[in-house]
Amino acid sequence: MRQSSQVRQTTETKIKLSLQLDESTNVSIQTGIGFFDHMLTLFARHGRFGLQVEAEGDVFVDAHHTVEDVGIVLGNCLKEALQNKERINRYGSAYVPMDESLGFVAIDISGRSYCVFQGELTNPKLGDFDTELTEEFFRAVAHAANITLHARVLYGSNTHHKIEALFKAFGRALREAVEKNANITGVNSTKGML
């Protein structure tokens, strides 16, 4: 089974995270940030991943450190769980509608970290979650996992719906990218490595 568990502890946060790429029954998220818990749960369910997150952070300051560090640890776990990247599709993309909003995510498990984020999030806060942290989360995951990730809100009016569409699309795109493909020999690259 492709899986990884890691702990990251700093003076600002303590993150314990486990990711299972090939199992989807065990999802438990506790970050202390309700909206973020909801988004991570949606990511795991729509990606069909097992994901357990326990996070303690300096949320009395704000949620920035917790959200970013969860992204870092998720990226690290993804990188470790993928092992040698043999026989995976490598690429994945998904459009996801959420009522009036439409989100799009494209992923390349390339060994090169890059993140492009486009989306106008007009409501600055949802509960205890600063909506600008959506971009910080995706950047942290892409950098730590060494993947290329494009996330875009094509249109919409409700900020909650826009972010929800992105997290669901992230799960679906990542599922496609990490899926094993019997038609691929070795890694999906003319270089012979990723």
UniProtKB/Swiss-Prot annotation:
Presence of keyword Zinc-finger: no
Primary site of residence: cytoplasm
Pfam families in alphabetical order: IGPD (PF00475)
Functional pathway: Amino-acid biosynthesis; L-histidine biosynthesis; L-histidine from 5-phospho-alpha-D-ribose 1-diphosphate: step 6/9
Catalytic activities: D-erythro-1-(imidazol-4-yl)glycerol 3-phosphate = 3-(imidazol-4-yl)-2-oxopropyl phosphate + H2O
InterPro entries from the UniProt entry: IGPD_sf (IPR038494), ImidazoleglycerolP_deHydtase (IPR000807), ImidazoleglycerP_deHydtase_CS (IPR020565), Ribosomal_Su5_D2-typ_SF (IPR020568)
Keyword Cytoplasm: yes
EC code(s) of this entry: 4.2.1.19
Enzyme class: lyase
A GO term for molecular function: imidazoleglycerol-phosphate dehydratase activity
Assigned protein family: Belongs to the imidazoleglycerol-phosphate dehydratase family.
Protein name: Imidazoleglycerol-phosphate dehydratase
Gene symbol of the encoding locus: hisB
